[in-house]
Amino acid sequence: MKLVDLSITEFAKVLGSDAPAPGGGSAAALSAANGISLTKMVCELTIGKKKYAEFEDHIKVVHEKSAHLQDQLLEAIDKDTEAFNVVSAVFDLPKETDEEKAARREAMQKALKHATESPFSMMELIVEALETTKEAVGKSNTNAASDLGVAALNLKAGLQGAWLNVLINISGIKDQDFVQEYHGKGLELLQTGSDLADNIYQTILESLS
């Protein structure tokens, strides 16, 4: 059964068990999925309201983007655990002969690269989700303004969590060109996303103060 098909209670219990997966990566993806779900909700609470008629077309576009990102981030919950399981499986490979040891090392490097690409892709989705959320600020139902703030917080948590997973995976990769590429691009995504999240949160905070 997929993680996304579990109830909230079931997911929390398996997350808190002694099973190594799901772990922080899947939890980060869930945080991000919750964030963009709130953005989508705010759009739904805005569409069709006369008070926000001038923003109707704009918010419909934001809603469509949010729905698409929601699907992708929900998929990321399982993708992260699947990537971790590939790494775990390598530890079970034989290592008696030199050939087996070499094959195991090669398999581990390949698995770690795949495990790095998963949270990195998540970071890209989250930055897109934050950009989408920002598009709703000031043009959506003010009664749900706090929900956009919570959306930004959840998305930022997901972003930071995904970044930590990128870092822990590249720490075991020997291909320095790969490491430098993902570290550099990851830092850029982290900065861009964090700035967006902070801007959204501060704007909402000031509007409610």
Q: Which residue ranges define each predicted feature?
A:
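Phosphate-handling active-site elements
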Residues: 38-58
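A structural-propensity feature for long, helix-poor, extended segments
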Residues: 51-87, 189
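Polytopic transmembrane helical bundles with strong interfacial aromatic enrichment
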Residues: 4-6, 121, 168-169
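Amphipathic alpha-helical interface segments
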Residues: 80, 84-153
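Short, hydrophobic/aliphatic alpha-helical segments
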Residues: 3-21
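Preference for long, well-ordered alpha-helical segments
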Residues: 129, 144-203
